[in-house]
Amino acid sequence: MFTTYSSISSQDLTIEHWQKIAPLRARLRAILMASTLFGILSVEMSGTALAVCEGPGAPTTTQTKCLTAVQIPGNPLQSYDISWVNPDRAEYYLADRSNAGIDVINTQNLTFKRTIPGFVGAKLNANGTVNNNISGPDGVVSHGRWLYAGDGDSTLKVIDLNAPNDSAIKQSISTGGTTRVDEMALTTDGELLLAANNAEDPPFATLFLANGDGSSSHVTALTKIIIDDSIVPAGFGLSMEQPAWDPKTERFYVSVPVIAENPPDCNFDADSGPITCDGGLAVIDPATLAGVAAAVLGAFDPATNTGVVPLHACGPNGATVGVHDNLLLGCTPANNPSNTSTLVINATTKNFANIGNIVGSDEVWFNKGDRRYYTASNRNCKTTAPCPTAAQQAAVLGVIDSTSVLIETIPQSSGSHSVAADSKRNLVFVPQSAPVTVVIGGDTTNVGAGICGSTNGCVGVFIHDVKKDRDYHDRNRDR
């Protein structure tokens, strides 16, 4: 007597089950063409079994493979933003504007847990597209039991993950703007949080005292930080994007998509023609801000390792800290049409290297479990670079090793710009947009539906079998 995988419910499946199923899936497809085949890796939705991990988004030749898809109840995924993983809690969090809440997925058995409500949701323009600047939730990070999420009404929501939905939001703190609190970062101990109001003009960041490992919420806004007007001039819609915390230098590093005079006489006014200015990296030392209600960040000062570092050939969105205090920055032609690569810069020396054949990233993530960077590159070049227009771009999941070498790219649904990884399980989570036939501004390809096995959008789950790769390299090392 034996147990078939199709008889196991999705809630019973652990990572170990999924790993056993994956190699069987390909073999059984060659033997069986009946519909029962799809019970091996399927999801249930409205009573219908749906095949997942099909098509261009599930190649069999890559090291990073599509494992399954987690369906999100409620409205189809039209608009979502940043995602995060807390590996100690085995939880993935997605800022889901389409359902006006934070989706929570169990990363151990890969099942949907709940959506935490209380956000403004997707606010629409007259043509039905989403106005990202006033929609929410947006940025999200977590430490221990505490989840922090930005909302479209310029508030920071503080969520107790141990609480039920109706009492999960413990604080809602205004940053004093009129647009969204966007991307953010925590110190390693969870005691300080930096969040950017990217859509304000001029943009600003807020430094908060956070909850750390405390059992009650006492989050307090400490300092409002702007960048000097000579670097980020007001009135031109310039921005601040993803912060990241580097524990070695004890600094926050914030992506600044476009800065003036970089290079000299460049154009930073989108209304006057294509942007030709590169971006910068803002370096903030929170230790210097004690008791300071408002601060202005100027040009970079090597003596203090603070200020704005001009970047070359990069207008960054995402930022993440990897090995050796290197930061990977998601350069994108959405900020500077001439961008063709991804940048890695050392937090201490500011030495940098460009990674070719991958560009157009929003959120980027370093997974310490397999020592790889993952990029949500929704504006990667389809063929040759540069690729300044949307017609020349396509969404991919970029995979980069710790030596800053591109390993592979995997197609994703158009607009896919969010990624997070579970370092304990080496799972990578990538939200997929619902098709354009279902939602305005949705996926214009068949990639998302193939990954999801549905037309509602989903969270695609990818796996990197570290042991298999190491065994392969060991066998071939001396050949």
PLM features per residue range, with description:
Residues 12, 16, 20, 44, ...:
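Intrinsically disordered, low-complexity polyampholyte segments enriched for Lys and acidic residues
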Residues 38-48:
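C-terminal segment of classical bacterial N-terminal signal peptides
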Residues 2-5, 38, 472:
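Aromatic (phenylalanine/tyrosine) cluster motif
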Residues 23-38:
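Sec-dependent N-terminal signal peptides
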Residues 49-479:
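Predominantly soluble domains enriched in secretory-pathway, periplasmic, or organellar proteins
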Residues 1-26:
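N-terminal secretory signal peptides that target proteins for export/translocation
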